Amino acid sequence: MSPRSVASLSTLLICVHASLVAAHDFWLQPSEYWISQEALTPMTLQVGHGPFRQRSPIPARRITRFQAVAPGGTVVDLHEQLRLGQAAEDGNFRFTAAGAYVLVLQTDDRAQAHLPSIRFNDYLKVEGLTPALEQRERLNQMDRDGSERYSRCAKSLVQVGPAGTGPQGQVNKPVGLPLEIVPEANPYGLAKSASLPVRVIYAGRPLPGALVKLTDLDNDASPFEVHLTDRDGRAVFTMPSAGSWLLNVIWTKALPRSEETDFETVFSSLSFGFPPDHAFLQTSAYGRED
């Protein structure tokens, strides 16, 4: 996507009614992304950006998967650690082995959204949902109200121990979500890359033409960077080195007329972040030098 296209899209993202856009961004937010072994770490489920950001009110019955993929590839069920709606957290986790963990959360697809035609069309344009736009245009339905059923998927990268300690390979592997963002460079790796290439996987295959947004969660009124995936489902972002960050993507497909809604949509995110003093933690916060 050209700089001019990105600028135009960013303007559109800001101009569209904020509550419409913010309502669809959902992610896992650990209190810290870099933790020591055995540290009990709280996390929350977040939704929205800027002034519309809040704890997600999603009920526990809708969460079908909450796991951690450990550095060695073992899958740990974290369902019992959910504490939705508590005053300060929605759950917690504790890991013993050093390395990079992938937190994984998935919901069912029983939620529905019904919007007037103008708002639905704006939403489709902002999120780059071309299958829905093309169908509505082809069937002369741009003036009709729109509806979708939807599910949410979220991943979060957690590093246990200093940078580079323990296995890191799970960061770059899909975890079997219906829609997911797979980083092809490790944000937590010792060999720091200037770019962050990612691949979007939908229904087990690379997804071309998807709009992927990178947001600085400390300055989250609008995305920091936006790209469309290429024919291989890839997009390349600037690699962050400080703060908390969110990548998110949305995709949809048309449903048969016999269904209650017009489309089935999946919202997917990947969150990651760095300690306040990244360089210091790499050498001394865990009591040794590498």
Where do the language-model regions lie?
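Mid-chain, structured segments of secreted extracytoplasmic proteins
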Residues: 67-113
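Structural motif
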Residues: 50-57, 199-207
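Short acidic/polar inter-strand loop motif in beta-rich domains
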Residues: 108-116, 253-258
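Beta-strand-rich domain onsets/edges
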Residues: 24-42, 133-196, 201-206, 218-220, ...
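N-terminal signal peptide c-region/cleavage motif recognized by signal peptidases
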Residues: 16-18
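N-terminal, post-signal-peptide region of Sec/Tat-exported proteins
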Residues: 44-82
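Glycine-centered loop-to-beta-strand initiation motif
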Residues: 87-91, 229-243
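Short amphipathic beta-strand segments in non-cytosolic proteins
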Residues: 64-75, 211-227
